[in-house]
C-alpha cells in the first residue's frame, strides 16, 4: 500500500506503486491532461516517475512557476532537436533555463543568421505539433559517454566524463533526439505551444575564453500567448528606455574603447549625478553619518590582512612602486576600519557612522561590461557603522527607515527585501549567528517590512539584508545592502574600550542604499525613460526666444531664474521656434519657456510642460512658484 498526501491535506492510497501521471488521473481527467510534472517530497520530478513509498505530492501544471520552468527547459531541448534536424553537423552542448526563457549553445562551422532562426523556430513548431512523447532512461556514465561519442557529440561526452563514475545519468528522448539532462521534462512535445527565438550571441565552451567559441541561441517560452506578447512588449519598451541609447540622445555620457568600463560624463549627465550625490549627502548627514575620504591606492599588506589579496586579487587592479605592491581599492571597508582605529575609541563614541562616496575599481571581464550597469570604475554611497552588540538592532532599524525613504523619493515604490542566512562554511558560533539573524529580523519587523529568507546565502562573515527595487517595467534590481560583519574588525584589529575598561571588537555594519552610483543612474534613466523628475533634471527649464528681438529678454530671464536656484539655460539660436521646441522636447526638459514680443513687453512667459502640455502665459513669479511647488511635493 502506497499513501500519497496531497497539498490540501487529503491522503490517497494505492494498492501498488503508481506514477505521478496516474495519481493525477485518479484525481480527475482535467488534472491528468494539465499535469507537467510533480513535486515529490519537495523534489521536482517527471510525470512518469514511479512512487513506491509513502510520500507527499503536488501535481505541477502550467499555473505553477515550476511548470513554466519545465516548459522552458523542454523548449530548450526542442530547439536542439530542431537544430540537429536542420544542421546535422552542428554539435550540441548545454541548454539551461534562464530568467524569462532559455538558451542553448551550439558548435557550428558558420554563424547562425536571422534567417536561420526563422527556419529553426518554424521547425520547432512542426516538431511540437507532432506531440511526441518525452521518455527518460537512466544509464551508467560509461554507457552515456559511449553513446554520445558514437554519434559524434564530443561536447556532451566531455560533460558526462567529468561526472563521477558512480553517478546515474539521465537521458531524455523525443522523436529522433536524445539529450543528457537532470530533468524533469514535459510528458510530450505537444505541451510546448508558445515560444519564440530571440537572438544569437557568442559564448565560450565552459565559460572559459581559452576554449572554443560557441553560438548561443536565446529563446523565450510561456504558457499563454498573452503572457509572451506582454513580455515582448516589455522588451520593446526596455529597448526604448535603454540607458545607453538615452545617454547618447540626451547627451549625458559616453564610453569608449580606450577606457573600457569607465564613464565619460558630459555636463548634463554630471549635473544629474550631482543632484543624486548631493541628495544622498544631505540624507546621510541628517541621519548622523560623518563623511570621510580614504585613499584609492593602498599597500598590499593591508589587503592581505583584510583577506582581499588572497580571495579577491583577480578582481583587483594592482601596481608597483619602489618595490612595494599596491592595489587600487575594489571596496572601501578596510579604509574605514583604519579611520576607526586611528585613536582610542570608547563605548561612549559608539555608534560611529562613517560615510564615503568612495571611488572603487574592479577588474571585470570585458565581456561582462554593460553601459553604466556593469563598469570597472564606480562610486559607491558606502558607509560603515561601528557599534556595540546592544546597538546593532536600533542601527539596522534606522537604516531600513532611511533606505525606504530614499527609494520612495527616487520614484521606487515596490521594494523586495531578502535576508541571506548562515552558510555551511562560516565564522563565529551558532549562538552568534542566532543573535545576528534574529536581530536583523527584529529590525525588519520593527519597520513593518516583509522579507524572503534565503538559507545558506549569507557571507561566511555574517548575515545580510538585500533591497531589490522594481522599476517601471517590473524588472528587479538589487541596490541596497545591510551586511553584518563578524570578521573584518578582528582581522584588522578594530577595538573599543567598553564600560568595564575591557577591549572589545565593535559590530561592523556595511551598508549602501543606491550601491554603485553609475549603476543606479542607469536604473534611474531607464525607470523614468530619461524624463527625470523636476528635482533631478539636469535642466529644469529652457528659455526660447522666437526672434532676435527677444534675445536680450530671454537671456536676462534665464539669468534671473538661475539666481533663484533654477537649473536653466537660454536657447538664443537663430532657428525656427518649432525646431527649438521639438529639439528640447526630445531632450525631455520639464519646462520650455517661450518668449515673443508680447511676453517681453508684459514681462511674462508662455509655459509648456513636458509632454506638450500648454500651461499658457503667466508672470515669471507664477512660473517660479509652480516650479517650487513641484520641488515641495518631492520634499
From Swiss-Prot:
It is found in: Cytoplasm. Transmembrane segments: none annotated. GO terms for biological process: threonyl-tRNA aminoacylation. The keyword Amino-acid biosynthesis does not apply. Residues 242-533 are annotated as: Catalytic. It catalyses: tRNA(Thr) + L-threonine + ATP = L-threonyl-tRNA(Thr) + AMP + diphosphate + H(+). One of its GO terms (cellular component) is cytosol. Binds 1 zinc ion per subunit. The keyword Zinc-finger does not apply. Homodimer. This is Threonine--tRNA ligase. It comes from Burkholderia cenocepacia (strain ATCC BAA-245 / DSM 16553 / LMG 16656 / NCTC 13227 / J2315 / CF5610) (Burkholderia cepacia (strain J2315)).
